[in-house]
Amino acid sequence: MGDYIVRMTAAQGTVRAFGAMTTEMVGQAAEIHGLSPIATAALGRTMTAAGMMSKMLKGENDKLTIQLKGDGPLGGIVVVSDSKANVRGYVHNPNVYLPLNERGKLDIRTAMGYGYINVIRDMGLKEPYIGLSQLVSGEIADDLTYYFATSEQVPSTVALGVLIDATGVIGAGGFIVQMMPGAEEETVATLEKRLIGFPSVSKLISEGTTPEQILNMLLEGMEPKIVETVPCSFKCNCTRERMERNLISIGKKDLLEIFEDGKGAELQCHFCNTKYNFSHQDIENIVKENVK
């Protein structure tokens, strides 16, 4: 079974929930970027979150960007998703290695450090919606829980996980459960109780538990209903034309310098590492068409 996102409602629509299996997507990102295990886990968690949050977008052409910037060795993470859960992303420093933390786990908290999380929703309006909050733990799931509470005023629980062994990514996924207006205190209390000691989501996924089963474990007795199930994948939208526009955007002075150098130019996409080569003749054509 491939990666996918499931969206559910429960408790007469006062709870909405999203579950994700993203093992293949995270493994592909790790391979494309040559990520260390700790960078794989950090980027994978963020990509999983973006995939689920893309199903909160209303318009077909809407886009979601999650930016994390920390003072730890990873530096930062950028992930973009469209409304169809086509996700792409990169980490600033892909080859970070740190000792395991006191629980014997990958120390993402130290790798990310303290800083901020930025969520940008581009809905095709003049200005995108931008939400900002602090990184409170660097673990990403806790940071998004805090973001939803403070920036969007939506009480939420976010769980994200990436399980890695010597062969690579063997389990990745997550869930987001949110309280909507009208949610009863009893519902909130039941969920809080179930979350105490809840198994690791990446371990559950690696053992074959589906996102639906995970959400049903959390929402049992609340009449959970599946709203939609959609595929989720690593997909970049870079093209040679887009890279040519990037070349043009560097400005007349720098473009002329590249032309006069006579060697052409090589541009590389941050998101998928695809390289685009522009010969000296290509640069000459770009200069003729765009430099007056």
UniProtKB/Swiss-Prot annotation:
Disulphide connectivity of cysteines: C236-C238, C269-C272
Principal place of residence: cytoplasm
GO CC aspect terms: cytoplasm
Presence of the UniProt keyword Signal in the record: no
UniProt entry tagged with the keyword Zinc: yes
Domain of life, per lineage: Bacteria
Post-translational modifications reported in the UniProt record: Under oxidizing conditions two disulfide bonds are formed involving the reactive cysteines. Under reducing conditions zinc is bound to the reactive cysteines and the protein is inactive.
Alphabetical UniProt keywords: Chaperone, Cytoplasm, Disulfide bond, Redox-active center, Zinc
GO MF, one example: protein folding chaperone
Pfam families membership: HSP33 (PF01430)
GO term, biological process aspect, one: protein refolding
Compartment(s) of residence: Cytoplasm
Protein function: Redox regulated molecular chaperone. Protects both thermally unfolding and oxidatively damaged proteins from irreversible aggregation. Plays an important role in the bacterial defense system toward oxidative stress.
Stated family: Belongs to the HSP33 family.
Protein's recorded name: 33 kDa chaperonin
